[in-house]
Amino acid sequence: MIDAARRSQGLRKERTLASPRFADGVFRNASGATPGLRRGSTGGVLRDFLRGGSRRFPSSPLPSVSPLAGWSRRVDAPLRATWLGHSTVLLELGGARVLTDPVWSNRASPVGFAGPRRFQPVPVALDALPALDAILVSHDHYDHLDRDAICALARRGTPICTSLGVGAHL
């Protein structure tokens, strides 16, 4: 596990160390929040994962429509959401465009040869995205924080919004 305080500098480090959620080098959930599976419930999930066979992958490509035509004009509705795969959604809210958890890599992994693979490609190239007002990164798992995608988007100058601990990676 990465010590967020060690990776942080300046004001971010001060805020990390002062956070009531930060202790012993890691951020902790508030009392009562118990992430993960309940005791005794993991056996079936693990068995399905290891022996699931064809049930683990779609039998054919999922239907997909290019979002490019819709993005060429601003939305009239108060909200439009375009799902781009797993955790990545382009939200259009009151004229602003916010991209959540941009993942464009083929695998959710720190290396390109291992880790869970996409069922199908992202429906649009990263450089074909419209101008963005903000990027929201919810947390630092590989299926939500794709380093290559974030670096490419950061070069556009779009603000990246995330929590204190995740900001240390950026």
Enumerate the predicted regions with their spans.
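Metallo-beta-lactamase
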Residues: 1-128
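A generic "binding-loop/recognition-motif" signal
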Residues: 87, 141, 166
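Glycine/Thr-rich phosphate-binding loops of Rossmann-like dinucleotide-binding domains
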Residues: 108, 145, 170
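Active-site metal-binding motif and surrounding structural segment of the metallo-beta-lactamase
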Residues: 113-162
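Short, polar loop motifs at secondary-structure junctions
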Residues: 163-169
